[in-house]
């Protein structure tokens, strides 16, 4: 299939494979691309191609990730696969690869394992909204009862982490067999199971709202005063659309203020509207330059509120990644870099956790010295003297 054009006519969805090491995530990724390539919907990627994941940097953290793309009859998918468990943890916490849904791969021969549980928990914490399950290595299980037992265990595990375990689609098959069939040039009985899995992914994982359809939010990067025109705030619109005449709120650091947009410009040109992804200057009516600062956000009124205290799931960089060389304890006070600014905060570790070592991932409670616009899923970096020592995501807002 030629690579030249990106088909924009089909809705786009981001997914990824998750699950325990050696349960077949990468083999399944290869099998999906191989089976769909026979239908002219993907380029075949073999296992080694995917397993040799290039390293990427996201928020100062090196993560090995493979990206493959393919289509079904209904959608265009970007699919991410990570070689190592630590890469998954980092990927999910930094949001390097935002997932609209995930395919949880569980070996039917082994059942759920520690990382199966950990990936489900992480999915819950970082807000992966939907999971579809592939029970792999079905060809190695002769006993139908054993297969049913594993399925039941997986459903219970999903329910334990507040996913709808009873309603989750679970497809059994063999990624390796499907891949072998596809390499021989046909979609056989195992390939059909992969197609069935993709049909479930199509049906069960909803098409995400596009960024432009969400409520308006723009982190403030800079503030200028233009003689005779008023105050301009600049930044990159994170989501939604802003138009002249819109009422907006300025949230974070200080008390929330309301104002009206009197102009939107990009590269010195006036625009009717700015939308997600645009770098714009927004002119605000009656707002003084000293009332706005970097680290605040402009948003649709009532859509996001300032908070000081929250719980977060964090990954702490190892020494090799340029992180700390020593553990930290409760009352550690680093800076939390949220969107465009650093705010000092103090960390409380969960009960029973004495200290956190470089390379760990853990749930923490944070209390910031000044309030910042936060919501579930807001990403942050943890910094010490300007260098990144960790990354996290807000999993619960306390006050």
Swiss-Prot record:
Q: Which InterPro entries match?
A: EF-Tu_GTP-bd, EF-Tu_GTPase, EFTu-like_2, EFTU_2, G_TR_CS, P-loop_NTPase, Small_GTP-bd, T_Tr_GTP-bd_dom
The role this protein plays is: GTP hydrolase that promotes the GTP-dependent binding of aminoacyl-tRNA to the A-site of ribosomes during protein biosynthesis.
Where would you find this protein in the cell?
Cytoplasm
Organism this protein belongs to: Helicobacter pylori (strain G27)
> Where in this protein does the record put region G2?
60-64
Q: What is this protein called?
A: Elongation factor Tu
Which GO terms of the cellular component aspect does the record hold?
cytosol
- Gene encoding this polypeptide? tuf
Record's keyword annotation contains Coiled coil: no
Keywords for this entry? Cytoplasm, Elongation factor, GTP-binding, Hydrolase, Magnesium, Metal-binding, Nucleotide-binding, Protein biosynthesis
């Amino acid at each position: 299939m030629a690579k030249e054009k990106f088909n924009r006519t089909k809705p786009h969805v981001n997914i990824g494979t998750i699950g325990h090491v050696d349960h077949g995530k990468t083999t399944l990724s290869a099998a999906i691309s191989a089976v769909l390539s026979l239908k002219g919907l993907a380029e075949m990627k073999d296992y080694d191609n995917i397993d040799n994941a290039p390293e990427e940097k996201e928020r100062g953290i090196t993560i090995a990730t493979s990206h493959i793309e393919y289509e079904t009859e209904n959608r265009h998918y970007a699919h991410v696969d990570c070689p190592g468990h630590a890469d998954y943890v980092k990927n999910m916490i930094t949001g390097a690869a935002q997932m609209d849904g995930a395919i949880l791969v569980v070996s039917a021969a082994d059942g759920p394992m520690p990382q199966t549980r950990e990936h489900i928990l992480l999915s819950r914490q970082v807000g992966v909204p939907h999971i579809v399950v592939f029970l792999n290595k079905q060809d190695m299980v002769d006993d139908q009862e054993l297969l049913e037992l594993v399925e039941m265990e997986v459903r219970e595990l999903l329910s334990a982490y507040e996913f709808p375990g009873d309603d989750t689609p679970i497809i059994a098959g063999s990624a390796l067999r499907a891949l072998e069939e596809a390499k021989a040039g046909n979609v056989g009985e195992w390939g059909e199971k992969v197609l069935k899995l993709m049909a479930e992914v199509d049906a069960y994982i909803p098409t995400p709202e596009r960024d432009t359809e969400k409520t308006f939010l723009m982190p403030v990067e800079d503030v200028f005063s233009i003689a005779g025109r008023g105050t301009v705030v600049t930044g990159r619109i994170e989501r939604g659309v802003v138009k002249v005449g819109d009422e907006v709120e300025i949230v974070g650091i200080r008390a929330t203020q309301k104002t009206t947009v009197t102009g939107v410009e990009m590269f010195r040109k006036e625009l009717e509207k700015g939308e997600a992804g645009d770098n714009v200057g927004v002119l605000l009516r009656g707002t003084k330059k000293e009332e706005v600062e970097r680290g605040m956000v402009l948003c649709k009124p009532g859509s996001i509120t300032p908070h000081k205290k929250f719980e977060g799931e964090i990954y702490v960089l190892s020494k090799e990644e340029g992180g700390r060389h020593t553990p930290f304890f409760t009352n550690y006070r680093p800076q939390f870099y949220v969107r465009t600014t650093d705010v000092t905060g103090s960390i409380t570790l969960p009960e029973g956790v004495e200290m956190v070592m470089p390379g760990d991932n853990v749930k923490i409670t944070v209390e910031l010295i000044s309030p910042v616009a936060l919501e579930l899923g807001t990403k942050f970096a943890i910094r010490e003297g300007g260098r990144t020592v960790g990354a996290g995501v807000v999993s619960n807002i306390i006050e």
